[in-house]
Amino acid sequence: MKRIGILTSGGDAPGMNAAIRAVTRTALANGIEVCGIRYGYAGLVAGDIFQMTSETVADKINRGGTFLYSARFPEFKEEEVQLKGIEQLKKHGIDALVVIGGDGSYHGALKLTRHGYNAVGLPGSIDNDIPYTDFTIGFDTACNTAMEAIDKIRDTATSHQRVFVVNVMGRDCGDIAMHVGVATGADAIVIPEEPYDIKEIAENLKQGFANGKKHGIVVLAEGVMDANKFKDELLKYGDFDARANILGHMQRGGSPTTRDRVLASEMGAYAVKLLLEGKGGLAVGIENNKLSHHDILDLFDAKHHGNYALYSLNKDLAK
């Protein structure tokens, strides 16, 4: 193996740049050249590929987003399009690939491995929704961003004795909502994985005000319901003032936390180690605080298991 490529795909996540840096410098330290591929699989097919050096990744570890840029490119599911990507890999002398992203990115990595190009996937997703890893790159930063926003929302909620329904990211996974809900002392957490009773939530909020509380916070994962609709449903059972707030894409931005920078660096170096061993079609993770890897194919049949003890804990603490 003389040269590897690296790309970021799908939704961006803080810490991706730290992973790119680790992959690049670990490979270079082992005598392997590195090519950056801009705009994910779309850039691969278009041949938007350039040589990277240690200087290329300097001063990037602290930056959010991905300096290689990203793009959603569902066309890569098609065999004909994959072969165009393979042509570009051959043209640029790339022997293996590191892909940073989520589920769709992993599908692309598996396709390339089946075409004879070893590819290793790193879990880059703020949702923390990828199986066989306790944490994904970007999750911790997203949680801290959401926590800081909700802390500020609590200030104005208290001033006006209001309830705020705060929508956080997590289409199919409630991990951000659970972690942030506990961290901000939310009155209720609503996630896709657990049933909820909106009347019960309203009653608990009313009881809180009756007991002297000056605010109410409901943390709602985006995959459950639109925040404004949830707020309107809540008001059918409560005589309090309520507002909805959608945090949205701010959760994807910002300088990555220490935890995300370290995790991304460890995973990036580990991915290169696997490629040096001639391995491909693998997904890197961290389980019980140890780096691990699994066949990408296994991930598609598995389901991420969140720490649902946090959901139960918050119910107890919110009483």
Curated annotation (Swiss-Prot):
This protein's GO CC annotations: 6-phosphofructokinase complex
Keywords in alphabetical order: Allosteric enzyme, ATP-binding, Cytoplasm, Glycolysis, Kinase, Magnesium, Metal-binding, Nucleotide-binding, Transferase
Residues involved in substrate binding: 125-127, 162, 169-171, 222, 243, 249-252
Biological-process GO terms, alphabetical: canonical glycolysis; fructose 1,6-bisphosphate metabolic process; fructose 6-phosphate metabolic process
Binding site for ADP: 21-25, 154, 185-187, 213-215
An example Gene Ontology molecular-function term: fructose-6-phosphate binding
Binding-site residues for Mg(2+), renumbered to this chain: 103
A Pfam family annotated for this UniProt entry: PFK
Primary residence: cytoplasm
PANTHER family: ATP-DEPENDENT 6-PHOSPHOFRUCTOKINASE, PHOSPHOFRUCTOKINASE
Xref: NCBIfam families: PFKA_ATP, PRK03202.1
Role: Catalyzes the phosphorylation of D-fructose 6-phosphate to fructose 1,6-bisphosphate by ATP, the first committing step of glycolysis.
Subunit details: Homotetramer.
Name assigned to this protein: ATP-dependent 6-phosphofructokinase
Species this chain originates from: Lactobacillus gasseri (strain ATCC 33323 / DSM 20243 / BCRC 14619 / CIP 102991 / JCM 1131 / KCTC 3163 / NCIMB 11718 / NCTC 13722 / AM63)
